Amino acid sequence: MGITFYSLGAAQEVTGSKHVLEINGVPLLVDCGAFQGTRAEADRKNREFAIPAEKLSAVVLTHAHYDHCGLLPLLVKKGFKQNIFATSATRDLANLIMMDSARIQKRDAEYLEKQAKKRGEAFNWCPLFDESDVVKTMNQFVSISYNRKLFAAPNVEIEFFDAGHILGSALTNIRVINEKSEDVNILFSGDLGRQGKPIIRNPDTTLPPPDYIVLESTYGDRLHDHADAVLDELAFIVHRCVEKKGKIIIPAFAVERTQELIYYFNILTMQRKMRCSAIQT
């Protein structure tokens, strides 16, 4: 039995998660995320699509952030016809995020075409995918509950465990069944949450012992403050801003981070540490 692993994104960088696990020469893809950054660089890297779409046995999606699911419609557009395995929450969130991306790309194309016409230049940029590609992609999803084993490909069994990152996020154990020797367990962390988050469960630690771990390390070199310390700091900032009759703008991811901030503001209001003010999202 031969197992080969390589990454096509999120290696020495943060976005564009794509990890390929080849088992006896047959590739399985873990995540198919979009690169993010400056418009030109991200567009170039997203179009340099080095995945053999028609050869993939399956896709395993760890969670629905754009840098993990954003290029699934492009994968389908390029000929991928097999199953995409994810939790039901990840499936539903990914649908919203991929549809939103398709609409943004359409608006970008319309805007850029107008700008090119004003300058008298030729325009040949097109979106990576459209809404019809997203619909086709959603038809290939197979949803799996946590702690349920399922064969994703011949001799390849997957099982999801709560990663505690966002709704539906999953640590993924891939068990490669070897009839001639011991099985091999390969654990993909996806994006891993931390304990004590207010609206997301703690990461599951009741996993089978892995032989290999593919671990994300975005915050691997830092310690996070406790939630109580964050609340006190947030209350201080809001109180100071109110005294100065100012406004607070908080850039936050639409999925999980924004909901967590609203939760914190509600807690502060209930504890009378903050006046009830207008919050717009």
Predicted regions and their residues:
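Cap/insert and terminal regions of metallo-dependent hydrolase folds
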Residues: 83, 171, 193-280
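Divalent metal-coordination and catalytic microenvironments
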Residues: 5, 31, 63-64, 94, ...
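Well-ordered alpha-helical segments embedded in enzymatic catalytic cores
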Residues: 7, 71, 233-237
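Extreme N-terminal starter segment of soluble prokaryotic enzymes
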Residues: 1-4, 27
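Short catalytic-loop micro-motif centered on adjacent basic/acidic residues
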Residues: 6, 60-61, 248-251
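Pre-active-site segment of Zn-dependent metallo-hydrolases
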Residues: 11-13, 23-82, 86-139, 192-203, ...
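Short helix/loop capping segments that flank catalytic or ligand/cofactor-binding pockets
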Residues: 16, 38, 69-70, 95, ...
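Catalytic core of the metallo-beta-lactamase
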Residues: 8, 14, 20-23, 144-205
